[in-house]
């Protein structure tokens, strides 16, 4: 504490010295000491009087003093001397003016040109006018010459004096103006210096007063510390007023002493802190504005750093979410539904009119899936580049939720399908066995079939789309009847899988890879699950054929298709418009391919039963007919009854055959190449399935 007092005293001495220097500068500039106080009488004289201060009142007072002779004798002498001096100066000025008046008048007065004017003489009326004129003429030559010269000389002299006077006056005015400007500048400079000095003096005085207060406070604090240092050895009572005492014997008293010392030390420390804060506040008054600006800058920097840290944390979080989403997609085997997940989940199921059209639609769906996969990979790459943006976190969370929903829906559909497949076997044995005949279109070498059979088969295949359209026009069932309808067997897609076992024996299969006719009775899942299976991995796409029974090949091909209007759900009714557009585009292709396949079906079936053209077909048919002979009669009766109903509309389709024959020829070539690929891919899988289980197992990927 003593050190603080010394430093404050040193600062106080320095401030006093600087104040003295400022006072000396003011004394030099103004001629008086700023610390001196003016006499009270001078102030009273200046303030009293009729004029009320300066001006005429002061002059009247001075006159009264000089006239009355009042006041102190020293003042009287000064006033008399001043008056005499002023009076003497005035007299000398007047005398000098009187002496120099003529000259000054010549200089100051404007020069006038003198002119001699002849006075008119009084003419007597007695003499005539012409006599007077004659006398004038006589007198003019007698005029003396020196008078005219004197006049001219005076005039010229006046003119010269006037010009000289004007030049002198101009020079004098210029000099006076320069002097006035210089005097004004000096006066302003003196005023500025004086103002600056007085401002500096005020600042020094305030600093001096502040230092004096600090020194005084420091001295008081030091005295207080000395006093408390003496008291600290004693015990302070808890009650007020506090008393300090010390016991004669120290029993438990040392504890009390320590506690008292601790409290007093805390009190001292608090007092020291308050003292330091007070001094800092006194020093920080001029710097308050600058400190506020610095604090504001620090706050702004901290906010910027926090925002940068938050942005840096968000980017890794988005990367982690994207990785988790990719893992889920890899487990399920479906493409990640980035951005367009809602569209893929809400994909509507098209209406299947015939097996040929269904195969064509499945191929189109595969192409669409490939295009979507490519688009989603591009979206993935673009989103990986934008991982640093915090907005992607919400998108990723939504995507993960959508993927989980899709997985849950698929699992529910699978469990429902397993439950529906078992009762469908019993129902299939009781109901009519649908028969569906497909055959690969023969090569150019195998085109020696009868035209009558071809026409009949084409008419049967063309009747199929019309029957489907008639069934679609029927009213949709209520939503409550959907679970019952979905439990019924649907043989069409499974027949596709069954028909894939024999396409390898031909060199030129049709565009849709339709194999030889095999009437099947298969428990088929509902079309919703078939549409879902397009997104599932191959392990979940397999369906076991529950009962496959081959019948004898009939002489006339029969085509039976169950109406699927009972199995349509609300989503399928919404998609009817889209399905019609899609089927109308592919109707020409499917009808031509179906007609050609049906014609080839009848010929190949006849040839297989009579001549045994294909050893593989005959072997498979002979092995399968032994197990299915019990149901031949029922299937033949049902097929004949259904063929009768279809034969009614054959007359309407004859006109279509001529129009579609041209399209069929064009698409034969493109369909051959496609069927080669599908036949090669499906043959190896079918052979494994037949050899392992005895019954063929088919996958939707072969369609």
Curated annotation (Swiss-Prot):
It is found in: Nucleus speckle; Cell junction, Desmosome. The modification Phosphothreonine is found at residue 125. One of its GO terms (molecular function) is DNA binding. The lineage of its organism: Eukaryota, Metazoa, Chordata, Craniata, Vertebrata. InterPro entries: Pinin, Pinin_SDK_MemA, Pinin_SDK_N. The gene is PNN. Its main location: nucleus. This is Pinin. The modification N-acetylalanine is found at residue 2. Residues 87-100, 348-357, 366-386, 417-433, 665-676 have a biased composition (Basic and acidic residues). One of its GO terms (cellular component) is nuclear speck. Found in a mRNA splicing-dependent exon junction complex (EJC). Found in a complex with SR proteins. Found in a mRNP complex with RNPS1. Component of the PSAP complex consisting of RNPS1, SAP18 and PNN. Interacts with PNISR, CTBP1, CTBP2, KRT8, KRT18, KRT19, PS1D/PNO40, PPIG, RNPS1, SFRS4 and SRRM2. Identified in the spliceosome C complex. The modification N6-acetyllysine is found at residue 240. Residues 46-148, 284-314, 331-394, 408-703 are annotated as: Disordered. Residues 223-285 are annotated as: Sufficient for PSAP complex assembly. The modification N6-succinyllysine is found at residue 240. The modification Phosphoserine is found at residues 48, 58, 66, 96, 100, 114-115, 354, 382, 388, 450, 457, 565, 670, 691. Pfam families: Pinin_SDK_memA, Pinin_SDK_N. Residues 2-32, 165-236, 354-411 form a coiled coil. PANTHER family: PININ, PINN. Residues 479-489, 589-642 have a biased composition (Low complexity). There is a cross-link at residue 159 (Glycyl lysine isopeptide (Lys-Gly) (interchain with G-Cter in SUMO1)). One of its GO terms (biological process) is mRNA processing. Residues 572-588, 646-664 have a biased composition (Basic residues).
């Amino acid at each position: 504490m003593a050190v603080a007092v010394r430093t404050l005293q040193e600062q106080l001495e320095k401030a006093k010295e600087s104040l003295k220097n400022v006072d000396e500068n003011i004394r030099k500039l103004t001629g008086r000491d700023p610390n001196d106080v003016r006499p009270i009488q001078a102030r009273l004289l200046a303030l009293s009087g009729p004029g009320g201060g300066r001006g005429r009142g002061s002059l009247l007072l001075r006159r009264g003093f000089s006239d009355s002779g009042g006041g102190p004798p020293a003042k009287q002498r000064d006033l008399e001397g001043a008056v005499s001096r002023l009076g003497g100066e005035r007299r000398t000025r007047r005398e000098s003016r009187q002496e120099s008046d003529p000259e000054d008048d010549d200089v100051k007065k404007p020069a006038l040109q003198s002119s001699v004017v002849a006075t008119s003489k009084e003419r007597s009326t007695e003499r005539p006018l012409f006599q007077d004129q004659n006398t004038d003429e006589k007198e003019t030559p007698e005029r003396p010459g020196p008078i005219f010269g004197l006049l001219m000389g005076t005039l010229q002299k006046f003119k010269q004096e006037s010009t000289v006077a004007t030049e002198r006056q101009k020079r004098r005015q210029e000099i006076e103006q320069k002097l006035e400007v210089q005097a004004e500048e000096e006066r302003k400079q003196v005023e500025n210096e004086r103002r600056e000095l007085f401002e500096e003096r005020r600042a020094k005085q305030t600093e001096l007063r502040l230092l004096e207060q600090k020194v005084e406070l420091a001295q008081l604090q030091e005295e207080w510390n000395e006093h408390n240092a003496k008291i600290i050895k004693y015990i302070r009572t808890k009650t007020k007023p506090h008393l300090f005492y010390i016991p004669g014997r120290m029993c438990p008293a040392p504890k009390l002493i320590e506690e008292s010392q601790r409290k007093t030390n805390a009190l001292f420390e608090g007092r020291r802190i308050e003292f330091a804060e007070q001094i800092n506040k006194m020093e920080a008054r001029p710097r308050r504005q600058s400190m506020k600006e610095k604090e504001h800058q620090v706050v702004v920097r901290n906010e910027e750093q926090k925002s940068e840290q938050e942005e840096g944390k968000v980017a890794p979080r988005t990367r982690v979410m994207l990785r988790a989403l990719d893992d889920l997609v890899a487990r399920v085997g479906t493409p990640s539904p980035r951005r367009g997940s809602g569209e893929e989940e809400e994909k509507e199921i098209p209406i299947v009119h015939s097996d040929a059209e269904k195969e064509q639609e499945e191929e189109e769906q595969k192409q669409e899936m490939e295009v979507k996969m490519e688009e989603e990979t591009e979206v993935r790459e673009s989103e990986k580049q934008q991982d640093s943006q915090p907005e992607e976190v919400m998108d990723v969370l939504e995507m993960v939720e959508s993927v989980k929903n899709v997985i849950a829906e698929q699992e529910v559909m699978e469990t429902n399908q397993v439950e529906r497949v078992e009762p469908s076997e019993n129902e299939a044995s009781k109901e009519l066995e649908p028969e569906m005949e497909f055959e690969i279109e023969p090569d150019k070498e195998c085109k020696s079939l009868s035209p009558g059979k071809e026409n009949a088969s084409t008419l049967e295949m063309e009747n199929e789309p019309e029957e489907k359209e008639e069934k679609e026009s029927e009213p949709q069932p209520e939503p409550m009847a959907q679970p019952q309808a979905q439990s019924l067997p649907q043989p069409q897609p499974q027949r596709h899988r069954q028909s894939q076992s024999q396409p390898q024996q031909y060199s030129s299969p049709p565009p849709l890879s339709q194999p030889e006719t095999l009437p099947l009775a298969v428990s088929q899942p509902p079309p919703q699950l078939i549409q879902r299976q397009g997104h599932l991995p191959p392990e979940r796409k397999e369906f076991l054929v529950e009962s496959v029974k081959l019948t004898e090949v009939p002489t006339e091909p029969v085509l039976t298709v169950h109406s699927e209007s009972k199995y349509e759900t609300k989503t399928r009714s919404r998609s009817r418009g889209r399905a019609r557009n899609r089927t109308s585009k592919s109707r020409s292709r499917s009808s031509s391919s179906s007609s050609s396949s049906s014609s080839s079906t009848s010929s190949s079936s006849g040839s297989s039963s009579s001549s045994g053209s294909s050893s593989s077909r005959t072997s498979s048919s002979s092995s399968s007919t032994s197990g299915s002979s019990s149901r031949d009669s029922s299937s033949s009766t049902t097929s004949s009854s259904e063929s009768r109903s279809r034969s009614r509309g054959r007359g309407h389709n004859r006109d279509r055959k001529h129009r579609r024959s041209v399209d069929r020829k064009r698409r034969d070539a493109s369909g051959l190449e496609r069927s080669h690929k599908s036949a090669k891919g499906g043959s190896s899988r079918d052979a494994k399935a037949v050899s392992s289980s005895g019954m063929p197992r088919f996958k939707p990927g072969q369609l």
